[in-house]
Amino acid sequence: MPDKTSYIFSNARIATLGENAEGLGLIDNAVLAVKDGKIAYVGPENALPAEYASFEKIDCENRLITPGLVDCHTHLVHAGNRAHEFELRLNGATYEEVARAGGGIVSSVKNLRAASEDDLVRETLPRLDALIAEGVTTVEVKSGYGLDRDSEIKSLKAARRLGEERDVTVRTTFLGAHALPPEMNGDKAAYIDRVINDMLPAIAAENLADAVDGFCEGIAFLPDEIARVFDAAKAHNIPVKLHADQLSNLHGAALAASYDALSADHLEYTDADGATAMAKAGTVAVLLPGAYYFIRETQKPPVELFRAAGTKMALATDNNPGTSPLTSLLLTMNMGATLFRMTVDECIAGVTREAARALGLLDQTGTLEIGKDADLAIWDVERPAELVYRIGFNPLWKRVFKGQI
């Protein structure tokens, strides 16, 4: 394979995922030209511009090319694991009971605060490598296990370093409003003050966050508390995202939409008004079947409402130590189909085009269109449905990141 960024993939089936394409935008007998790390042409081989005819050709032998996969919701940077809580839940404890007893997110805080930045990078890289091995070229990574200024900064710096250690685009999200740390003794107002006046200004000053997130739930923060964080984020010109309506309907989806959020995530209890508000605002619904499966939820996100409203839907692993220790977007797609009844096209778009949209990156990646980064996944499959259908099997042939094979 050429160690350069200008060449042609020939003899391929290509799923462009273009905005105006029908379905997945499939093109048979297609070629994709890469020039200087960007997509220069994608389409029928017989229409290839003459200027690319001399480029070295790589025969795909009729394999399928899709955009590189995008995991748009992860908590990839964390220390330790919570296998003991998994056992507790197997014995009957609920997520809420574990959290209120001092477990859950707060139990990860102790581990992260004790870890160095180097420790965090070292522990996270194997999880990132698992995603990369399945064709992921872009990953979002949240903080939220530090819950104080220095630890949140440490988390975000570790996340940024992942993109230096591996050929992958990393988008960082500040999730200070994730849980109330034990030292606050239940004083949520004072903690939100700390998020707004201490953590966020320091993080913004170092340009460490591409977005600001919050956990809007009875066991975390209420809508008025999240609104304070979002107002502060907007003052720093940082876009927002929201963990919303996972365990109850606090109208988090509508709250996110009112701030033109990039995405609202989980959404098991979102109602029709929330779905409509998201569609109007262009806020992507990021569905997380790994968490639904792992904590044995019974309330499914309202996929039919999202379809009816025209709300864009993405899928993500939600990789985290407590409720979704999942490092496979291929399995996530299968779960989206089997658990949430999403279609094959919705699942594949959900980990490419719509996931890129949820990160504000659709102008750069997520579809195979001229001028975008040559982020590609090439699969040894006959039809796209195989990517969603198989369980525990990885048919990736080649992964391309910004033109580099």
Curated annotation (Swiss-Prot):
| Record-level GO cellular component terms | cytoplasm
Location(s) in or outside the cell:
Cytoplasm
Instruction: Report which reactions are catalysed by this protein.
Output: 4-imidazolone-5-propanoate + H2O = N-formimidoyl-L-glutamate
Q: Write out the residues that bind 4-imidazolone-5-propanoate.
A: R82, Y145, H178, Q246, T323
The cofactors required by this protein are: Zn(2+); Fe(3+)
Per UniProt, the keywords (alphabetical) are: Cytoplasm, Histidine metabolism, Hydrolase, Iron, Metal-binding, Zinc
Pathway-wise, it operates in: Amino-acid degradation; L-histidine degradation into L-glutamate; N-formimidoyl-L-glutamate from L-histidine: step 3/3
Q: Note how many cofactor molecules are bound and how.
A: Binds 1 zinc or iron ion per subunit.
Q: Where does N-formimidoyl-L-glutamate bind?
A: Y145, N320, G322
Q: Any one Gene Ontology biological process term?
A: L-histidine catabolic process to glutamate and formamide
The EC number(s) this enzyme carries: 3.5.2.7
What are the protein's GO molecular function terms?
imidazolonepropionase activity; iron ion binding; zinc ion binding
Q: Is Cytoplasm among this UniProt entry's keywords?
A: yes
Which enzyme class, named as a word? Answer: hydrolase
Q: Which residues bind Fe(3+)?
A: H73, H75, H243, D318
Residues engaged in binding Zn(2+): H73, H75, H243, D318
Entry's family note: Belongs to the metallo-dependent hydrolases superfamily. HutI family.
What is known about what this protein does?
Catalyzes the hydrolytic cleavage of the carbon-nitrogen bond in imidazolone-5-propanoate to yield N-formimidoyl-L-glutamate. It is the third step in the universal histidine degradation pathway.
Q: What is this protein called?
A: Imidazolonepropionase
* Name of the gene this protein is made from: hutI
